[in-house]
């Protein structure tokens, strides 16, 4: 150990124990300010940075002291009673592609259940269709004539396992789109694409897999009243995004471009978090261009979707606010 080595705080007891105990007492998730206060009030021993790594070796790695709010939302399901997320995919089949899809799914090693034609499912899937290469009338008609559909589900996962699960589903979707399935609906995001769109996502994955996952697995933006938000980032082990019309206006965005700007901002932030997320902390600022106004990110729990819903994000939401 060098006498010049940086000293860092080591909470005693560990920070994850303090945060979990407070959540249990309150009976609800902690806010960013509450997390930071518990961290700031914690009794700590100052140790060399290399020593902290040695202390944690072979034990549960504690919450990142310097980035407690973000790291707690990312890992809280490991320490409290909570629903763990899964990737859930609906595969609609019929015609010549049906036996090929069945074989692909049987060999996938995933949790697969088979179900018969469901008229209500047709409306459900079509209502979730994205605008990327919209399905034509023929494809929509084929969806309505499906004879069988499959519910494909991953094992529940924590944040550090999410990306591997989603990459596995990306490869599965590529194979099913070529079979072809009649439609593929990613229920964990409330999102269905046309087969042409799924093939485009697969082509993008060959060049940039992270960009393909953000583009194909995340619904953005969804509008509710004057709020725009994303859905599906939990499949990548990350929080979703939420921004208000008033914040978009404060950045200088014209009302007719609110949806487009929210989509572009969410996509850029999603890609940044996937590729360089370890650098991100609550309070960091973002902008799409040098000329556009900046927004800062504040972490909070997911409140607009029920916890038992497959679209619920246990890793939280990043609310974007005027700088």
Model-derived regions, located:
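Aromatic/basic-lined ligand-recognition segments
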Residues: 190-323
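Internal, hydrophobic cores of structured domains that mediate oligomerization or house catalytic pockets
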Residues: 115-223
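Short, charged early-sequence alpha-helical segments and their helix-coil boundaries
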Residues: 33-39, 45-75
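A ubiquitous short alpha-helical element
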Residues: 1-8, 131-135
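Amphipathic alpha-helical packing elements
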Residues: 8-48
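Short amphipathic alpha-helical segments
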Residues: 34, 161-172, 257-265
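Conserved aromatic-histidine-acidic binding/catalytic patches
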Residues: 3-10, 89, 157-165, 253-257
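Long, low-complexity, Ser/Thr/Gly/Pro-rich intrinsically disordered segments that act as flexible linkers
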Residues: 81-126, 133, 141-145, 276-309, ...
